[in-house]
A protein has these predicted regions:
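Catalytic cores of the polymerase beta-like nucleotidyltransferase superfamily
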Residues: 1-205
Length: 205
């Protein structure tokens, strides 16, 4: 894992598409963050093509506005049922979603979704290393938001859930499979509380 200053982190967002996203977000008055695996993989020095952007507001409105700004070379796909949209532009794909809160009923894997804040969105992430976010708005461009100690967990090579693991796994039992996959792929250790919860809840997969 590498450690980066904010100025060094900004260099990883120097491609023109990020500047266009930032300008679109500022024009719309929306907070906008790159989240999840793309941010994680910068610090782990792993290649990553999946760019996921969380908008505090409508991800679909953001994607449509970006598509108009980019012009004829952009292709926008809207998935209204999921509240998400994708913009393809010159070989780059960016997924947009509005920040949201999710809750699950015990007998269902279908989430109850409400609009939320960035913090709400990070709360619902599976693991701390995937809850990292980097702001794209001009005033805070390149600022890392790490509320759960994901950077420290990467340093310690640890897989840990942002919330009580029983809640995280109960919300979506398939996260237990992802936990094992990440630990295997990255050579990380599963935090004791997380592992014990995984053992307790394994029948739910």
């Amino acid at each position: 894992m590498i450690e980066l200053t904010q100025e060094e982190l900004k260099q990883h967002f120097s491609e023109p598409i990020f500047g266009q996203i930032a300008e679109t977000a500022d024009t719309l008055g929306m907070e906008c963050y790159v989240v999840g695996g793309y941010v994680r993989d910068i610090f782990l020095q792993r290649p990553s093509k999946d760019i996921d952007v969380v908008v505090v507001g409508s991800g679909i409105a953001m994607a449509e506005a970006l598509g108009k700004r980019l012009g004829r070379g952009a292709h926008v796909s809207v998935f209204k049922n999921f509240g998400t949209a994708q913009v393809k532009y010159r070989g780059t794909e960016v997924e947009f979603v509005g920040a949201r809160k999710e809750s699950y009923q015990r007998d269902s894997r279908k989430p109850i979704v409400e609009d939320g804040t960035l913090e709400d969105d990070q709360n619902r992430r599976d693991f701390t290393i995937n809850a990292l976010a980097v702001c794209l708005n001009k005033a805070r461009f390149g600022e890392l938001v790490d509320p759960f100690g994901g950077m420290e967990d990467m340093k310690e090579k640890t897989i840990r859930t942002p919330l009580d693991p029983d809640i995280t796994f109960s919300d979506d039992p398939l996260r237990m499979m992802r936990c094992i996959r990440f630990a295997t792929q990255l050579g990380f250790y599963i935090d004791d509380d997380t592992f014990e919860s995984l053992c307790r809840n394994k029948e739910r997969i």
